[in-house]
């Protein structure tokens, strides 16, 4: 009988340890990547601010060339929406919705997919760089809120 009690106590300690570790894990995650281009700011803004050439720049398409993309709402600007569906389990289905756009400064998309977390956002920030500010530095930042990690 004492062996059973020891086993139950050990199991409770392991469960408590997992809960404590889960409480101390970060509640949010941010991933950022920057690239610099010599394209004009207006071209960069048009390319990232609409879904007409989404296949040319988004990584989802390179992971699954047969992905199905469907747009709705306005062609560009706030409210434009792209829904995707893939047969690959790692991609699945979801959507990108443009929620904020400041020309020449930033574009913010709200993401909805099967991945863990809430309030998923993809923010593109534009900054003029180089001699005479002819280049554009594009910083893509993905943020997600995991809440309680238990």
Residue ranges of predicted features:
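Hydrophobic ligand-binding cavity/cleft-lining segments
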Residues: 6-75
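Amphipathic repeat-derived elements
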Residues: 2-23, 92-109
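Structured, soluble extracytoplasmic/luminal domains of envelope-associated proteins
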Residues: 78-132
């Amino acid at each position: 009988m004492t062996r059973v009690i020891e086993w139950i106590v050990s199991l409770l300690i392991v469960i408590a340890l997992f809960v404590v570790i889960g409480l101390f894990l970060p509640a949010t995650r941010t991933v950022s990547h920057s690239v610099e281009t010599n394209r004009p700011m207006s071209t960069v803004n048009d390319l990232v601010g609409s879904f007409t050439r989404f296949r040319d720049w988004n990584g989802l398409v390179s992971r699954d060339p047969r992905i199905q993309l469907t747009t709705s709402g306005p062609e560009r600007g706030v409210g434009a929406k792209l829904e995707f569906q893939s047969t690959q389990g790692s991609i699945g289905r979801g959507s990108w919705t443009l929620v904020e756009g400041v020309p020449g400064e930033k574009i913010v998309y709200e993401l909805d997919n099967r991945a863990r977390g809430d309030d998923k956002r993809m923010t593109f920030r534009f900054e003029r760089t180089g001699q005479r500010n002819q280049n554009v530095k594009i910083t893509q930042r993905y943020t997600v809120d995991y809440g309680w990690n238990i």
